[in-house]
């Protein structure tokens, strides 16, 4: 084979390879679905931060359709329902988030705050104690403050 036909064959195969890979649906790959889930979750959190809880539910629901076990989407929905004063739904989503990441100090602290708000002080104390075990958690001082307030509510002044 001469050089010219060989180069032509090589170029044709490269072009064919480029064309065939351009047709892949990113939602059919694990990476694509993970990126979409994360984008939907971030969008929902953005709406939540703006106080638009109803709007936050739509992308968070889509995130959970892509990954029903997403701890971040469940945690964000828990906050949505907590703000909307739907304690049963908030509790359900906090539990689902923690079932995926049981040692996550941020989740434990947020769930503890929810439990405190519901006057479930003993449960709140337990969540805060779990969160305090993470010595690298950046909000650890807040966890100790929450522990003290909860101990006071439980009339455990020596712990406070």
Walk through the language-model features, giving the residues of each.
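Canonical tetratricopeptide repeat
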Residues: 42, 76, 110, 144-146
């Amino acid at each position: 084979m001469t050089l010219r036909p060989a180069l032509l064959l090589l170029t044709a195969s490269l072009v064919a390879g480029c064309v065939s890979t351009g047709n892949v649906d990113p939602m059919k790959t694990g990476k694509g679905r993970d990126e979409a889930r994360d984008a939907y979750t971030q969008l929902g959190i953005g709406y939540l931060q703006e106080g638009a809880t109803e709007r936050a539910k739509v992308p968070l629901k889509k995130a959970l359709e892509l990954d029903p076990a997403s701890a971040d989407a469940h945690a964000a929905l828990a906050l949505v329902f907590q703000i909307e004063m739907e304690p049963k739904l908030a509790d359900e989503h906090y539990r689902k988030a923690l079932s995926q990441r049981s040692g996550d100090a941020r989740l434990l602290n947020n769930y503890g705050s929810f439990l405190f708000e519901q006057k479930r002080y003993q449960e709140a104390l337990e969540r805060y104690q779990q969160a305090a075990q993470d010595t690298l958690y950046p909000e650890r001082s807040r966890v100790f403050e929450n522990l003290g307030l909860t101990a006071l509510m439980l009339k455990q002044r020596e712990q406070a």
